[in-house]
């Protein structure tokens, strides 16, 4: 079963980047071409599984990195080659600060579930991550809600006039939210 997360949108971009750069069509060690930032390890696993299913015949290497596991095992996976890196903010900063990952080839950054990242207190790490990727890159920001805080985040990290795509009614609460009225 494929759970199509926003990472699915960049599969084609990764394929384009692979073939344009210096004629190489395979993952180049610890230099990912795309980065997906998600709030939880469960989402890292989910996104990687979906990408692997969708790119089964494309030779695109997706590596998931998250805390709570052996960093050496994850380091070995990165050094085998990575096109698409899916990670939680804290673990990305760990592997970046330890020189395990290099960012100059990153062309696309996906910030998935931005509202949850903010709720979980990951804004400092998110800012740090966006400071270490190349200035010239595309950022895709996904959020279930579009609060004032998310609008400020978009203004801070996205192009001056980003394309905004909405699905559903923005005033309709998510089904998981229970609204009560007390009199």
Segments and roles (model prediction):
Residues 1-183:
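SF2 DExD/H RNA helicase N-terminal ATP-binding lobe
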């Amino acid at each position: 079963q494929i759970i199509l997360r926003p990472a699915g949108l960049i599969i084609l971009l990764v394929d384009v980047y692979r073939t344009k750069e210096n004629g190489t069509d395979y993952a180049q060690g610890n230099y990912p071409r795309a980065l997906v930032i998600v709030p939880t390890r469960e989402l890292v696993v989910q996104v990687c599984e979906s990408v692997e299913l969708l790119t089964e015949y494309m030779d695109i290497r997706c590596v998931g990195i998250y805390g709570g596991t052996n960093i050496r095992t994850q380091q070995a996976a990165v050094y085998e080659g990575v096109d698409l890196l899916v990670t939680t903010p804290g673990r990305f900063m760990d592997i970046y600060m330890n020189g395990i990952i290099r960012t100059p080839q990153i062309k696309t950054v996906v910030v998935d579930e931005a509202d949850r990242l903010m709720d979980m207190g990951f804004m400092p790490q998110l800012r740090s991550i966006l400071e270490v990727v190349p200035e010239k890159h595309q950022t895709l920001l996904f959020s279930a809600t579009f609060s004032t805080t998310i609008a400020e985040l978009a203004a801070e990290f996205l192009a001056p006039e980003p394309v905004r795509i909405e699905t559903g009614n923005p005033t309709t609460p998510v089904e998981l939210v229970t609204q009560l009225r007390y009199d």
